[in-house]
Amino acid sequence: MNSLEVTDLRIAIGGRTIVNGTTFSVGKGQRVCLLGESGSGKSLTASAVLGRLPANAVTEGSIRVNGVEVLGVPASKRPEEARVAMVFQDSAVALNPLVRIREQLVEPLRRHRGLSRADAAQAAVELAESVGLPDPAGIIDRFSAELSGGQRQRVCIALALACNTRLMVADEPTTALDVVTQKRVLDVLKKYTAGQHTPALLFITHDFAVASELCSDSVVMKDGDVVEQGQIHSIFAAPENPYTRELIRAARAATVDPYVQQFRRELAELRAEDAAEQPKAKVFYDIGDVSREYPMPRKGLFGKREMKTALFPTDLVIREGERVGIVGVSGSGKTTLLRLMLALDTTDTGAVTCSGREVYPADVKKLKWYRRKVQYVPQDPASTLDPLMTVRKLVREPLVRLGVPGDHDTMVREALDSVGLDEKFLHRRANELSGGQAQRLAIARAIATRPDFLLADEPVSGLDLPMRESIVALLRRISEERGTGIVVVSHDLSMVANLCERTVVMHAGEVVEDRSTRQLLADPRHERTKELLDAIPVLHVMPDALEPAI
């Protein structure tokens, strides 16, 4: 008997069919990935398996968990043998911020395993240790807000294991994590699923490379239909559907391996370039001895407030027109440095100068000169764009506020055209756009004032691979056509390899490596750079025809 059987599943919401006759299964001891872009129907299919469909959903077909029919049965009303554990994409939302981690683990251990409070408390520590949390007895006495993203995600896996189910569903659990933390989370999932006494796994993702690291089988969805399924390595070797082929090609382009191999072949040439004196453009950013520390929460009512150094004294020079990637794991100091460059925070020591003029937080009027020269591309455009404003008003807003001379309507159209949004988008509202369209809008809004530099914070981390590839290509084209410099903060060396000529690696608040991207990938010198490279998922099987051009 399979852990999960989905047969001819159809789901319609508001009269629109979103899942159209999906059929697949997850056997005992299997890890199966459900692959597809946003809107493919994969997450809605997972919601049906979990019994979490919206109230207005109309369903047909069958879903059996351990032989029990569960389609249309809410999770709370399912029998014990048909329960499904869940690992959510956003661990910050999944965990209760007002309850300590210990209590959140103890509750399912008592409910689903019948343990006493004392035994459950001990089992909670053991679970925390098993998923690789440091100082497990101490860390579970914290609140979720006191943990890093990777630690929270491992707590979510521990919670799922505490439920003692035969099936676990993980919905994009590593999308928001840096590659090193992602690898650790995947290792935990690998260790504690698909065993004789551990649950089978249905893994939802858009990333073939991540899927290939974890799963044995794959179900590929597009527009609510299953277009291909089978053993994941067989699909890699000979994808039958054009859509599958495109997903694999995009995944290959998003890995760093082809760049590393090419640059290593050119290593002697790169070393010669390194030794040669290159002509240098004018300095745009001169970051001198900047540092920043923040107060930590007090331990107890009268406890001493400790300070945490987010950025040790750092020097960095960025020249006009450069494309620079600042990479590192969570907590490396890269976002703190970006905030200082954006004048959103003050330095404790040192200064940031732009074209010889010091930049520091002040009122909006005093920073107009700087906002004209530098614009920001956010990680999550949905959180920065007013959902009730039209596209036209959103792109026009910085032109008006910064007093940019000229015909603003023409400038708006030019900016939208540059990012591939035609005039039909002018009167749409921000909440009517897809994730990729919203990111293009954020870029259009940033380039409308014709800045000298764009500062981008993880600009593609939340996007599907094909959309991620198109946004990176767009940023590169804008830089080449307009001479616009770009500083992009990311944990993803593969994205930086595709966009940036120079890469700065940060760790624990310090710059540990700063070289041309080609040289850094071909011959990484620092252990943290090597760790970032090693953590990037690799497609183990790949058709020669899909090799990307470099």
Residue positions per predicted region:
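Conserved ABC transporter NBD signature motif
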Residues: V58-L71, G350-V359
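ABC ATPase "signature
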Residues: V226-G230, A238, D514-R515
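Helix-to-loop junction immediately C-terminal to a conserved catalytic motif
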Residues: L50, L342
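Conserved ABC ATPase signature
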Residues: F143-L147, Q151, R429-L433, Q437
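ABC ATPase NBD coupling module
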Residues: E69-A85, E103, R111, S234-P239, ...
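Conserved ABC ATPase "signature" region
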Residues: D119-G138, D407-K424, D534
